[in-house]
Amino acid sequence: MVKSTSKTSTKETVTKQPTEEKPIQEKEELALETSSSSSDEEDEKDEDEIEGLAASDDEQSGTHKIKRLNPKKQANEKKSKDKKTLEEYSGIIYVSRLPHGFHEKELSKYFAQFGDLKEVRLARNKKTGNSRHYGFLEFVNKEDAMIAQESMNNYLLMGHLLQVRVLPKGAKIEKLYKYKKRVLVEKGITKPVKQLKDNMKQKHEERIKKLAKSGIEFKW
C-alpha cells in the first residue's frame, strides 16, 4: 500500500508542474509587452520633442498658421504697384543744394549714369546769371528718374547734402527759361552834355529847397 501512495504523489507532482509554469510565462510576456509599449511611447515623445510636434504644441499652433508664399503672385503685385507709382509721377526730378561750380554740364554728366536725359535746366539769377543752387532734370524713362531719386537723395557731394525729388505727373520746367543768363549790352549816351548839366542843376535846386523847408541851410 505504501508503494501505491508514492506513485500517485509523483504523478500529482508531475501534473502540477506545467500548471505553475504557465502563469510565469504569461507574466513574462506581459512584462515584455509593457516594456516594449513604454519604450515605443518614450521614442514617440523624444521624436515629438525634437521635431516640435507634441499634442500641446499642435493645439497652440492652430492659432498661428503659416501661409505659403507664392513668389509669382508677389512679383506680379510688386509690378502692379510700381506701375501705379510710375503713372503718378513724371520723368522730371528736382535737385537742390547744389555746390558752387556745379552747372548744367556737370549735372548732365553726373546724372547721365542713371539714364538718357531730355533736358537739364539750372536756376540762375536774372541780373547776374549766377547759379541759384537748384535745377531740374528730365529723363526719357520714368524708371530712371525714380532710381536717381532713391540713390541720390541725401547724397553728400562736395560738402553739400543733395535733395532730390521726383515731380508729379504733368509738371514742366518752362519756368526756368526766364532765368537764362542775359548778355549785358552797353548803351551809348545820346543826349548832349548841356542838357545833362541843366538836368543836374535842376535836381540840385529841388533838393536845396526841400532842405530849406526842414530848416537846414546848404550851400554848394
Swiss-Prot record:
Top-level taxon in the UniProt lineage:
Eukaryota
Q: What happens when the gene is disrupted?
A: Essential gene. Abrupt growth arrest prior to substantial depletion of ribosomal subunits. Fails to synthesize the 25S and 5.8S rRNA components of the 60S ribosomal subunit, and exonucleolytic 5' processing of 5.8S rRNA is strongly inhibited. Arrests at cytokinesis and fails to assemble a contractile actin ring at the bud neck.
Q: Which PROSITE patterns match?
A: RRM
Q: Name one GO molecular function term.
A: rRNA binding
Q: Where in the cell is it found?
A: Cytoplasm; Nucleus, Nucleolus
CDD domains, sorted: RRM_Nop15p (cd12552)
Main location, first listed in the record: cytoplasm
Instruction: Cite the record's Basic and acidic residues compositional bias ranges.
Output: 9-30
Q: Which Pfam families match?
A: RRM_1
Keywords annotated in UniProt: Cytoplasm, Nucleus, Ribonucleoprotein, Ribosome biogenesis, RNA-binding, rRNA processing
Q: What else is known?
A: Present with 4280 molecules/cell in log phase SD medium.
The UniProt subunit note reads as follows:
Component of the pre-66S ribosomal particle. Interacts with NOP7 and RRP1.
Q: What is this protein called?
A: Ribosome biogenesis protein 15
- Species source reads Saccharomyces cerevisiae (strain ATCC 204508 / S288c) (Baker's yeast)
- Give the source lineage, highest ranks first: Eukaryota, Fungi, Dikarya, Ascomycota, Saccharomycotina
